């Protein structure tokens, strides 16, 4: 949505790849920032000049294929991004091998992992949601070397060509869950809580 507002990234550059932003190339931005000279000139987190942001170790990650997810919510939905989207600090990102990222999205958006995360995550917030720390995911043992059909099914889901139920069944099959185990997860109130919201 274009509301006439823009985020201006006066970055400090990326070593040997991208020069820092020269504020003199953007006179309107410089004029605006000059109003705050007393504050920006004395801040401790500046880049090479007071106009530049400090170095961001993961700036390049935003231009890579990645998984993005909100940190807090009743339903933590994971999305696969290949469009170089940039997010704020209420969203975490993960980069890696494209097929592994797609599989990760499928697993994490499945009812199996929705159930698992709600069962094992202790950081519950008001309203029944959870706060999903990166450290929680780091401790979650995930198999991400499934056969190509799972990757293809998840990719089709990303493009709205199949349903969530199709992905759920593929994940159940990948983990060899019995019909009884599948039914248990599908009927658990934690999985279905706020699913329609």
Annotated model-derived regions:
Residues 1-150, 173:
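Polybasic, glycine- and aromatic-enriched phosphate-binding surface used to engage nucleic acids
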């Amino acid at each position: 949505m274009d509301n006439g507002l823009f985020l201006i990234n006066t970055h400090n550059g990326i070593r040997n790849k991208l020069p820092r932003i020269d504020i003199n190339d953007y006179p309107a931005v410089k004029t605006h920032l000059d109003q705050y000279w007393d504050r920006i000139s004395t801040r401790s987190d500046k880049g090479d000049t007071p106009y530049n942001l400090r170095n961001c170790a993961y700036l390049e990650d935003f231009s890579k294929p990645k998984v993005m997810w909100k940190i807090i919510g009743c339903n933590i939905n994971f999305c696969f991004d290949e469009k170089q989207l940039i997010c704020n600090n209420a969203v975490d990102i993960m980069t890696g091998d494209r097929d592994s990222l797609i599989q990760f999205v499928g697993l994490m958006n499945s009812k199996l992992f929705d159930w698992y995360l709600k069962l094992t995550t202790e950081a519950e917030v008001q309203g029944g949601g959870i706060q999903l720390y990166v450290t929680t995911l780091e401790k979650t043992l995930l198999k991400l070397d499934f056969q190509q059909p799972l990757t293809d099914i998840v990719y089709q889901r990303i493009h709205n060509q199949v349903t969530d139920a199709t992905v759920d069944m593929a994940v159940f099959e990948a983990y060899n869950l019995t019909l009884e185990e599948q039914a248990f997860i599908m009927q658990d109130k934690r999985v279905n809580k706020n699913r329609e919201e």
